[in-house]
């Protein structure tokens, strides 16, 4: 089968879709990926991509079709423009670049935003092939939960967009069983299935590495991942402040994101330098070592 994977994020960005695509290719499928420009999580264009963009036209034997987008930047307006720009660019430039290709199936990877489904359902109509939509984030629920959108009117509009997309997919996959009733609320068909994520193979054999930040005398709390709005770092910092009197507790934050500069400033302002280590971004194969240090 020739499969088209539509994802706003793809290698060199670290997302599970990379493993999914490799797995599909290893099973003998021909895979093409429609994606944007790598700028997650920093909001800046990937340095290696800038130096050698031709290197990122292929992922093993997988063809990568990239479309121009507005970069995520460091504020909510730029993030919104980033979301909209991919949907528009993939629905126009992306569709044009794919005009001579035929597919048997379209697979959508949606960690956020929901708008990644728009170019997919347009291509569904043009190519006359089914769409599978893997929902890893729940819109509009997530927007409301993290306070990005509070207006009921706007949330209802977004809910209408979610229904529009869901109802034009042939199969919807939810990464958690608790997702399924939420998805059903915005869909008029019952073809909704549970499809969980998985751990990368590097986590099967965790080894020690003494070069990583670690204080054997402390109780180590470690966070790894994106440093953004959804992670609610104001609450994390409040917790660190409450516990900073206990010198045996140490926090390590591994990752990068739009709010990294803000986090660095807040740590200084709140006098938390002795309680927190910002370890920066590390490749996935280093993550098991950090997890091994966590209490």
Language model feature labels by segment:
Residues 213-231, 236-241, 252:
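Conserved donor-binding/catalytic core segment of Leloir-type glycosyltransferases
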Residues 218, 252, 261-288:
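Nucleotide-activated donor-binding/catalytic signature segment of Leloir-type glycosyltransferases, i.e.
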Residues 170, 275, 291-295:
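Acidic donor-binding loop of glycosyltransferase active sites
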Residues 14, 80-95, 105-127, 132-136, ...:
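An aromatic- and histidine-rich active-site surface loop
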Residues 184, 193-194, 198-217, 232:
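Acidic anion/phosphate-binding donor-loop and adjacent secondary structure
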Residues 37, 178, 195-198, 281:
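Carbohydrate-associated surface elements
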Residues 115, 122-126, 152-172:
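Membrane-proximal helix-turn-helix segments that form the acceptor-binding/catalytic region
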């Amino acid at each position: 089968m020739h499969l088209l994977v539509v994802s706003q994020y793809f290698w060199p960005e670290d997302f599970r879709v990379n493993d999914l695509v490799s797995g599909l290719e290893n099973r003998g499928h021909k895979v093409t990926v429609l994606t944007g420009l790598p700028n997650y999580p920093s909001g800046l264009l990937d340095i290696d991509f800038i130096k050698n963009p031709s290197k990122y036209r292929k992922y093993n034997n997988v063809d990568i079709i990239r479309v121009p987008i507005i970069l995520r930047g460091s504020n909510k307006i730029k993030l919104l423009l980033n979301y909209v720009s991919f949907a528009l660019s993939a629905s126009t430039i992306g569709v044009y670049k794919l005009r001579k290709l035929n597919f048997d199936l379209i697979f959508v990877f949606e960690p956020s935003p929901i708008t990644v489904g728009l170019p997919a359902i347009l291509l569904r109509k043009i190519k006359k092939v089914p769409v599978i939509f893997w929902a890893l984030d729940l819109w509009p629920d997530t927007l409301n939960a993290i306070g990005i959108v509070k207006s009921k009117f706007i949330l209802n509009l977004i809910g209408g967009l979610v229904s529009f997309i869901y109802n034009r997919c042939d199969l919807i996959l939810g990464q958690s069983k608790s997702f399924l009733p939420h998805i059903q609320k915005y869909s008029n068909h019952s073809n909704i299935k549970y499809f969980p994520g998985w751990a990368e193979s590097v986590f099967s054999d965790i080894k020690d590495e003494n070069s990583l930040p670690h204080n054997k005398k402390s109780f180590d709390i470690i966070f790894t991942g994106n440093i953004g709005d959804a992670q609610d770092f104001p609450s994390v910092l409040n917790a660190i402040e409450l516990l900073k009197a206990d010198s045996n507790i140490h926090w390590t934050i591994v990752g990068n994101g739009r709010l990294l500069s803000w986090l660095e400033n807040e740590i200084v302002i709140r006098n938390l330098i002795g309680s927190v280590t910002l370890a920066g971004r590390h490749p996935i194969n280093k993550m098991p070592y950090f997890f091994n240090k966590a209490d």
